[in-house]
Amino acid sequence: MGIDYSIFVMRGLIQGYKYGLKDLSSYKVSVLLSVLTTILGIGVLIFAKHPALRSIAIMSIIGIATVVFITFTILPGIFSWLVTYKKGLRNRPVTFLDFIFSIISLFVFIGGALLMGLFALILEIIPANRLKKKWLFHVIFSKLTWFLIYLNFLSPKKIINPHKEDFKKPAIIIANHQSHIDLMLMMLLNPRILIVTNSRNYYHPVHGKAIRYADFLPHDAGYEKLTEMAAQKVKEGYSIMIFPEGHRSDTGEIRRFHKGAFQLAHDLKIDVLPIIIHGQNQCLKKSEFFLKRGTVVTTILPRIDLSKNEFGETIKEQTKGIQAYFKDEYAKVQSQFETPGYFSDYIKKNYLYKGPVLEWYTKIKIRLEKNYAFFDEIVPKKARITDLGCGYGYLDYMLSLTSAERLITGIDYDHDKIKIAQNCAIKNDQITFTAGNIIKLDFNESDVFILNDVLHYMPINLQIQTIEKCIAKLTTKGMIIIRDADKSLQKRH
């Protein structure tokens, strides 16, 4: 009975996640009615005088109560954790592989941090050259971070270094801040990189000792003290790494740069070395302490000599100029890597835990469509798009993810499909889904109309009528994209 109750409640949870319905209480009421009849049928034996019958009744009542507790509390809690977090739906639900790699990475991180802290204590009491001990510590620390990052082999990592940066010349390294792992991404690049960190990390009970021995710089020390400490480390050949945004970005967008990093580079008379991190916010979001698979790209840009005044004369002007330059370069990285293939996993995962048939249909459909790369290629990056017969919304989501300047309206006759499409975590204000008959509906003016495998469901006269309606609402230099089955190839269709 416990299995039956769990399946029944799970069905309610899946229906709620799939369609956005809040109807779990009706499933619980049905379970409670079954529990009541079971207790009345078997639990009444507790009043029997025969000890065996009483034992059976007591065990039945305890068993039923336990089953109901698990079904009503633990089961919904686990499902909720799989698909939601504190800000709403997860943009990609938790999967078994991601969970396993998250646990392994967590244990490796904690174990590595404690070992490095112990190693720091040992080095402190060994009578040897301080600089050599520090260098050994930094080399091992860098290798450990490399191991931790590359441990999750399901997530590809790319380091793009077109200018052959070797970090031999000290610099102020700046990078966008997306997740906790950004520090390790910087440390694995070279052992001679020190990071300016906050007091929470500096005095952390797990990795604080290792960070302090590695001579990371405490942000709370104040600018004068920080400059003094940084100047000494620069003389020893180290580069100083600072996140000019100050805080992690949950969306991946570049936030406002603070001028402290550039002031420090000016005072120390060293270059600024910009490094772009892309994809890390999707692997470990700021508001979601859980590792997911994804491609992480680290791009090292050319050094900037502030004394040449290429980005302005004052520190304020240089900060704004470098921020604008950084945003432009980040946009180039996005356009290079945020392709339909990059986003296909996001779309597939949004239809996970919504039923096995839909899950497999989604995977097969997107694979057969080759991630909708052709549509993304021919549809303008900035356009108003109406997708007639949008189905579950796969194409609409792909077009919206690959360009934030596409405004999309998806229309389909099937109300259930529209409900499913509307209830995805990746849905944003770019997309509007409408249930209705495209023959009767009035269309909004659009730059692009898409009729993808739709017209063959209509007779010829309605096909012509639908196309004429699209033409009437088409903007100047707009396009109508029609793809449909060829009846002459009926056996292959």
Give a label for each model feature:
Residues 450:
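A conserved beta-strand element that flanks and buttresses the S-adenosyl-L-methionine
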Residues 18-48:
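Pore- and gate-forming transmembrane helices of large, multi-pass membrane proteins
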Residues 341-379, 391-429, 435-442, 458-462, ...:
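Class I (Rossmann-like) S-adenosyl-L-methionine-dependent methyltransferase catalytic domain
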Residues 120-138, 167-222:
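Catalytic core of membrane glycerolipid acyltransferases/transacylases, capturing the structured
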Residues 91-170, 349-365, 373:
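Membrane-anchoring hydrophobic helices of lipid-metabolizing enzymes
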Residues 3-11, 55-90:
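Transmembrane alpha-helices and their membrane-interface boundaries in multi-pass membrane transporters
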Residues 464-476:
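A short glycine-rich, Lys/Arg-flanked "PGG" loop and its adjoining helix->strand segment in the class I
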Residues 226-352:
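Non-catalytic C-terminal accessory region of glycerolipid acyltransferases
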